[in-house]
Amino acid sequence: MPLLKAKPTSAGRRHVVQVVNPDLHKGAPYAPLLEKNSKSGGRNNNGRITVRHVGGGHKQHYRVIDFKRNKDGIPAKIERLEYDPNRSANICLVLYADGERRYILAPKGAKAGDQIQSGSDAAIKAGNSLPMRNIPVGTTVHAIEMKPGKGAQIARSAGQYAQILARAEGYVTLRLRSGEVRRVLADCRATIGEIGNAEHMLRSLGKAGANRWRGIRPTVRGVAMNPVDHPHGGGEGRTSGGRHPVSPWGVPTKGKKTRSNKRTDKLIVRRRNK
């Protein structure tokens, strides 16, 4: 997909770089697969801010995505590709032979009219979903389950994929884009190929207001605050008081390990690249 650099007709347009995909549907989304998507403004049920830098943004409907791909043996045709404001990847509206329509993540190279299928006997072809025990070693996959039947949780954003390295003892070994190597049950499903719209990472919003459209509020540095607001606040000039970087609540940050140990840690063969 080509990248479009905006003409510098104003300061806000000067640095804008957009991803242009002429194959995306230009009309309204498929209404039966839309749900209300209320905004919280980062507040909990007491009205207190629990997540900073959240608020505003354009109204959006949530597109119900089929992450389970459990209509086995029923062929489907991709009707159209669509933009989804809730994720970096594009989505496909697929029509099954029994008349049902569903949204799925758009794999790389997908186009209207392509045939896809789910199930153990599906062909090894981009967009087809099947248990990883039936996928050859070395295949690139995306939309990977971590528990059989739960739905895809790994490799769901634009340009993402994982590679199957080995299969043994009821598990498959995957190498993720982060460099992490981990084992997943072989009965978990995955979709062949990689997610499309990899150029998403090359776009440039161009101005602060574009982030506000996405519901992202400004991030103020602690050293720019007063002492009452942040441990780094106050002082004459820029100084953090000689302490290590901390959050507004005094929790060490920038290097402090925050990941809790989990029972499934034993399935991680190699940690991700730093």
UniProtKB/Swiss-Prot annotation:
GO terms for molecular function: rRNA binding; structural constituent of ribosome; transferase activity. Keywords: Ribonucleoprotein, Ribosomal protein, RNA-binding, rRNA-binding. PROSITE patterns: RIBOSOMAL_L2. One of its GO terms (cellular component) is large ribosomal subunit. Residues 39-48 have a biased composition (Low complexity). GO terms for biological process: cytoplasmic translation. It comes from the Bacteria. Coiled coil: none annotated. SMART domains: Ribosomal_L2, Ribosomal_L2_C. Residues 28-53, 223-274 are annotated as: Disordered. Transmembrane segments: none annotated. Belongs to the universal ribosomal protein uL2 family. One of the primary rRNA binding proteins. Required for association of the 30S and 50S subunits to form the 70S ribosome, for tRNA binding and peptide bond formation. It has been suggested to have peptidyltransferase activity; this is somewhat controversial. Makes several contacts with the 16S rRNA in the 70S ribosome. Part of the 50S ribosomal subunit. Forms a bridge to the 30S subunit in the 70S ribosome. This is Large ribosomal subunit protein uL2. The lineage of its organism: Bacteria, Pseudomonadati, Pseudomonadota, Gammaproteobacteria, Alteromonadales.
